[in-house]
Amino acid sequence: MNRRAAAERQGRTGERIAAWWLRLHGWRIVGSRVKTRRGEVDLIARRGRTLAFVEVKTRGDAAGLATAIDEYRLRRVAAAAEALLPRYGVGVENVRIDVMLVRPWRRPVHLTNVWHGQ
């Protein structure tokens, strides 16, 4: 398997783990790998009247996770979330962008409300 295919497989596995983790914590997954012209959102989750657009990053080590999220990536998720809000945001009071950091054999880390725009 080439490196790109291996990275794609690792990313999909991380998204499944993140979705599982969110479900265990009371979230309902209402969308996954949703693409727009502005970008892609890995997971869209809802709990009560809160809607979270979730970026999932999967890396093999802590050092890789530490550099996986930057302003550019969050800005693209925010742009995609803005485009998707009319479709997924009916009846919600709170909208936020979260990040899930996934490493093998470790609990996922859920960072909430990481983007406040600029």
From Swiss-Prot:
One of its GO terms (molecular function) is nucleic acid binding. HAMAP family: UPF0102. The lineage of its organism: Bacteria, Pseudomonadati, Pseudomonadota, Alphaproteobacteria, Sphingomonadales. Pfam families: UPF0102. Disulfide bonds: none annotated. This is UPF0102 protein Swit_0572. Belongs to the UPF0102 family. Coiled coil: none annotated.
